Regions:
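An acidic- and aromatic-residue-enriched active-site/binding cleft used to recognize and process polar
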Residues: 11-17, 72-74, 124-126, 139-141, ...
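Amphipathic, non-transmembrane alpha-helical secondary structure
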Residues: 48-56, 106, 146, 225, ...
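Short proline/glycine- and polar residue-rich coil/turn motifs
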Residues: 389-395
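Flexible, acidic glycine-rich loops studded with aromatic residues
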Residues: 119-134, 140-284
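Short, solvent-exposed loop/turn and secondary-structure capping segments
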Residues: 19-24, 79-81, 147-148, 167-168, ...
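Substrate-binding cleft of carbohydrate-active enzyme catalytic domains
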Residues: 1-117
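Predominantly extracellular/luminal regions of secreted and cell-surface proteins
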Residues: 282-317
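Aromatic, loop-rich ligand-recognition surfaces of beta-strand-rich domains
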Residues: 319-384, 395-433
Length: 433
């Protein structure tokens, strides 16, 4: 690879995402038991010895100047009760377990520097006291790029909304299994790295990166299918930056490149046969509750607000992706409970709620759906209540659960319970006819 101008950057995850290590070496976890957790024990001196030895072997194999240590999504649940972790916190003078991760990453950064290498980590590593030659890969949001740049770190932009190529690239029913979500080639091409950063900070962005996580990628051919032509779009962003974009012109060139790739034995997605976005998203739906007042008896999750309190009655259906700004997320016991005020007594014949199932991010259909009606908003009559068997299949699907009948009411209360194994409920519209 090096002879061909390609740098392979190895990634060794720490302190989280380490289930396989702690199954083989349970003594490096806080519990000392296999299959109990995914985090190294940062209070155990053996953890540092082990990771140093692993990194030495990695550096022997890989000539890359950059070594990626992960640093993302550590649960840290056991650190607060672990005697070794508590002892380490006291020694370091820190009062929160987050400081333990910062210490471990900083320690490993210095170790790599001593061996002539530079640390790369996901944006969670920003909290550490790292050397200025650190590179941060930002996957969560531009505000973290701003934070990293403020610390003097180089930044690689890799936001999940544009750069996660394990997501579907076309209508899910027509595609092999993917990790939920929807990122077509056109969306990748639309990405402008650091678009809401000051120009001086944008100049600190080293580049962009695509991620193809392989939980659902069983073969090299399928990996090629998920990579191309989306990788072509991201590559053009990498060298074209914020210059004027012209997707139709790019698509023409991409179609030609797809034929070239096929001639070379590569297995790309056939962009010319693309179906595109969910058809329900493309045209507003009219119904009797559009614009009505909605009272949330249980709040939506702040990370998935969509359009706020007007979301469920704005006439706008969601697309293939739960994070497209049209889907509202709910989590917890009895988490979906809203009351719609139609403004006056109204004849109604159906109340349907559109739900998503996307098992990758643990979004499931509800296990129970209930509809009640009222004239005064206080005394409700239940008109529909049905339980449903929970399943983690299909991977991505959409379903409208509905009551049908004949009633006259001003207020409609709609409730849904999460699946029998928990997870999220995602809703885009309550359609009243």
């Amino acid at each position: 690879a090096a002879e061909r101008g390609i740098t392979i950057v190895p990634e060794i995850e720490m302190p989280g995402h380490s289930e396989e290590v702690l199954t083989a070496y349970p003594e490096l976890s806080c519990t000392h038991e296999p299959y109990k957790q995914a985090d190294f024990c940062p209070g155990n001196i053996g953890t540092y010895d082990f990771l140093e030895n692993v990194l030495k072997e990695v550096m022997d194999i890989f000539p890359s100047h950059y070594i990626h240590v992960g640093g993302d999504e550590a649960a840290k649940k056991s650190w607060g009760s672990c005697a070794l972790c508590q002892k380490k916190m006291k020694e370091l003078g820190i009062d929160h377990v987050d400081g333990l991760q910062a210490h471990l990453i900083s320690y490993m950064g210095k170790f790599l520097n001593e061996h002539g290498r530079q640390l790369v980590g996901w944006d969670e590593v920003i909290a550490g006291n790292l050397s200025k030659n650190t590179t941060v890969m930002v996957w969560r949001g531009t505000e973290l790029a701003h934070e990293a740049i403020k610390h003097g770190y180089d930044v690689v932009m890799s936001p999940g909304a544009y750069c996660y190529f394990d997501m579907y690239q076309d209508a899910p029913g027509t595609q092999p299994v993917a990790n939920g979500g929807f990122i077509p080639t056109e969306k990748v091409y639309s990405y402008v790295p650091g678009s809401d950063l000051p120009e001086a900070e944008r100049n600190m962005i080293t580049g962009v990166q695509a991620n193809l996580w392989t939980e659902h990628i069983p073969t090299p051919e399928y990996a090629e299918y998920m990579l191309y032509p989306r990788a072509l779009a991201l590559a053009e962003i990498g060298w074209n930056g914020t210059k004027t974009k012209n997707y139709p012109e790019f698509k023409t060139r991409a179609l030609a490149q797809i034929e070239h790739l096929k001639a070379e034995g590569v297995n790309p997605f056939e962009l010319k046969k693309e179906i595109g976005e969910r058809k329900e998203k493309m045209k507003p739906v009219q119904h009797k509750a559009v614009g009505a007042k909605v009272t949330y008896n249980h709040a939506y999750n702040r990370y998935y607000p969509a359009a706020g309190e007007k979301t469920l009655v704005d006439g706008n259906m969601g697309g293939w992706a739960h994070g497209d700004g049209r889907w509202q997320g709910f989590i917890g016991k009895n988490c979906f409970d809203v009351t719609i005020d139609l403004g006056k007594s109204t004849k109604i014949s159906s109340v349907g709620t559109d739900f998503m199932q996307s098992s990758g991010p643990e979004i499931f259909y509800p296990s129970q759906y209930t509809v009640s009606v009222s004239e005064d908003g206080k005394n409700f009559t239940q008109v529909f209540d049905k339980k449903y068997e929970s399943s983690k299949e299909p991977i991505l699907d959409f379903k409208t659960l509905a009551w049908k009948g004949s009633k006259t009411a001003r207020y409609i209360r709609v409730q849904a319970k999460p699946s029998s194994f928990g997870g999220w409920l995602f809703v885009d519209e309550i359609i009243v006819k």
